């Protein structure tokens, strides 16, 4: 049996894969948080609930409408994004000129309301969501079997993350979004509808959370608690990467997922706290985060 640092290669590669899977969800969710905070200056505590909404929307589309996984992967983010747009336009937009604490408290209350509603109707136990037939099975890599769906999760999340990064950082629309945050009056003078841009930004963040939820549905059971169990870790990832940093959210999400996975191999007792230990160290040495800009 091949060993690496005294660990069987199958066990090492298996945990590396688990780390990449978790990192894919960390990256997608952190990216949504970074987009919302970086462009709206809102700490969106409802992000975990929107992730859960994505998974439940996919499940309900399947059970009530017979909508398959591939269509749900498109429809669920659009539905949750529309829900986010309504929330932003009708309620959240009224808090922009107030202290950040008000936005945090509002989104925290919204998360509790959404989670409580789903717990009332569906209970706290998880419900299965089957992966599509085309993504079932595994590929023999020689040293391990790679579940096809797990590989799809990593690839899909990477494509979406890079696509959003390109949209925000390299396109004219992204330039308008960034400028609208810094100087909305100037952007409006060019005939740009700034309130609409802000609404679309929040919808994008909510849609990213929902997309992650649909990807997660076949990996984990669909549960009202799935978002609240993950959101604290995701906030830690965002802090390490730098609040509002798009690239930082993506890179740090994957990196910390891998670190967490490898920690389960070499020091399992620390696997549940390693991300928070890294966050504490980063806050001490570089408070703005690894990719954040110093104030």
Report the location of each language-model feature.
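Hydrophobic core segments of alpha-helical transmembrane domains in multi-pass membrane transport
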Residues: 55-59, 77-83, 110-118, 156-165, ...
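Membrane-interfacial amphipathic/re-entrant helices at transmembrane-helix boundaries
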Residues: 1-28, 57, 69-72, 98-102, ...
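Transmembrane helix-bundle core of multi-pass membrane transporters
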Residues: 94-170, 197-200, 221, 262, ...
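Cytosolic-side transmembrane-helix boundaries in multi-pass membrane proteins
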Residues: 2, 11, 90, 121, ...
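Single transmembrane alpha-helix segments in multi-pass membrane proteins
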Residues: 11-64, 90-102, 238-246
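Helix-loop-helix "hairpin" substructures at the membrane interface of multi-pass membrane proteins
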Residues: 22, 144-222, 246-252
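Transmembrane alpha-helical segments in multi-pass inner-membrane proteins
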Residues: 26, 66-78, 199-214, 218-279, ...
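Alpha-helical transmembrane segments within multi-pass membrane transporters and channels
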Residues: 66-110, 117, 251-256, 286-287
């Amino acid at each position: 049996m091949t060993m690496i640092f005294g660990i069987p290669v199958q066990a090492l590669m298996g945990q590396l894969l688990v780390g990449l899977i978790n990192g894919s969800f960390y990256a997608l969710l952190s990216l949504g948080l970074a987009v919302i905070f970086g462009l709206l200056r809102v700490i969106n505590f409802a992000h975990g609930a929107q992730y859960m909404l994505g998974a439940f929307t996919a499940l309900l589309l399947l059970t009530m409408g017979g909508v398959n996984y591939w269509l749900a992967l498109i429809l669920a983010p659009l539905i949750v994004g529309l829900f986010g747009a309504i929330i932003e336009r009708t309620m959240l937009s009224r808090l922009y000129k107030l202290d950040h604490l008000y936005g945090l408290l509002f989104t925290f209350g919204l998360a509790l309301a959404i989670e409580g509603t789903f717990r009332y109707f569906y209970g706290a136990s998880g419900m299965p969501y089957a992966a599509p037939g085309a993504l079932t099975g595994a590929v023999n890599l020689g040293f391990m079997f790679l579940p096809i769906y797990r590989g799809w999760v990593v690839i899909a999340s990477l494509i979406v993350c890079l696509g959003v990064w390109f949209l925000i950082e390299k396109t004219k629309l992204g330039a308008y979004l960034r400028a609208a945050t810094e100087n909305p009056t100037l952007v409006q003078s060019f005939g740009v509808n700034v309130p609409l841009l802000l609404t679309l930004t929040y919808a994008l963040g909510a849609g990213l959370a929902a997309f992650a939820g649909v990807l997660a549905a076949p990996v984990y059971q669909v549960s009202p608690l799935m978002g609240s169990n993950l959101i604290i870790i995701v906030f830690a990832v965002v802090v390490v990467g730098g609040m509002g940093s798009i690239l930082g959210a993506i890179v740090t999400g994957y990196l910390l997922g891998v670190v967490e996975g490898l920690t389960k191999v070499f020091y399992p007792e620390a696997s549940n706290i390693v991300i928070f230990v890294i966050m504490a160290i980063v806050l001490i040495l570089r408070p703005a985060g690894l990719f954040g800009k110093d104030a």
